[in-house]
C-alpha cells in the first residue's frame, strides 16, 4: 500500500508594485484625514464649539453653521420618512403572512 503523505498546496506568488501600493496608501490617508477634518467641523457645529481651528476650517471650506444645521435637519426628516416607510412595509408583510396562514 501507498503511505499517505501531506497534500501539496500551491504557493501564492505575489509581486506588489511598490509605487502603486505607496500611491494607494497615500491617497487613502489623504481621504481619511479629510474625513476626520469634516467630522470635527460637523461635531464642532452641532455642539456649538467655538474653537479657532474649527472656525478656520469652516471658513476655508466656505461653510456656515446654518448650512450644516440645515443639512442635518433635512437628513433627519428623510431618516424619519424612511423609518416610517420601512416600518409600515414590515407591518404589511406580517399582516399578509398572518392572513395566509
Swiss-Prot record:
Its main location: membrane. Disruption phenotype: Deletion of the icaADBCR genes leads to the inability to form biofilms, produce PIA or mediate N-acetylglucosaminyltransferase activity in vitro. It comes from the Bacteria. InterPro entries: IcaD (IPR020510). GO terms for cellular component: plasma membrane. Belongs to the IcaD family. This is Poly-beta-1,6-N-acetyl-D-glucosamine synthesis protein IcaD. The lineage of its organism: Bacteria, Bacillati, Bacillota, Bacilli, Bacillales. The gene is icaD.
Amino acid at each position: 500500500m501507498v503511505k499517505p503523505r501531506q497534500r501539496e498546496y500551491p504557493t501564492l506568488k505575489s509581486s506588489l508594485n511598490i509605487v502603486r501600493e505607496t500611491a494607494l496608501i497615500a491617497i487613502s490617508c489623504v481621504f481619511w484625514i479629510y474625513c476626520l477634518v469634516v467630522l470635527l467641523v460637523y461635531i464642532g457645529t452641532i455642539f456649538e464649539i467655538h474653537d479657532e481651528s474649527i472656525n478656520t476650517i469652516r471658513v476655508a471650506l466656505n461653510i456656515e453653521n446654518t448650512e450644516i444645521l440645515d443639512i442635518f435637519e433635512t437628513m433627519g426628516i428623510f431618516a424619519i420618512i424612511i423609518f416610517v416607510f420601512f416600518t409600515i412595509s414590515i407591518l404589511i408583510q406580517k399582516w399578509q403572512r398572518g392572513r395566509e396562514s
